[in-house]
């Protein structure tokens, strides 16, 4: 049985109908990640594209079968660290996973993510990088490519788009000496599945699968 055939046997952890933009490959990525990580998982999805498509839920309704927390944009990793410590204290092994965009990871949440990485908090932190604050009108982020047009870095009247280089987020996290750092893409689902399985096997610190350039 190949990886795709094996993935097809996993239970889908999110409903078929969510309000993501048509053709959104972040939705495909989220579905794949939730399938592989399975029902014994607690997710934190901060404000962003995936937090607003029905994953988190409103009015006691959610598109997800697993518990999903809705943290602030800047405290995702530290909140998950506390949740993981609680489950370790009661002797229960649970996957504790962040699914956060580049705004919550590369910018607003970098401080607490850096702290979690340095402490060796046993969480899985998945960053989906769509290179901007997409669900609020496409403002530039620290992950936006140099020269790119966004609503806050226009290409008009002598302004040539974003002036700063894109932050090398995978390298920044690797320099924290995390036990596992990987880049992956929904264009290569078998590779993504294998890397998620490796992240789940890490038990001595933070695992960082980074989904690049969505």
Regions inferred by a protein language model and the residue ranges of each:
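Glycine-rich ThDP/TPP pyrophosphate-binding loop and its adjacent helix/strand module
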Residues: 92-96, 107-123, 128, 132-214
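Cofactor-binding active-site loop characterized by glycine-rich and histidine/acidic residues
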Residues: 2-125, 138, 143-149, 162, ...
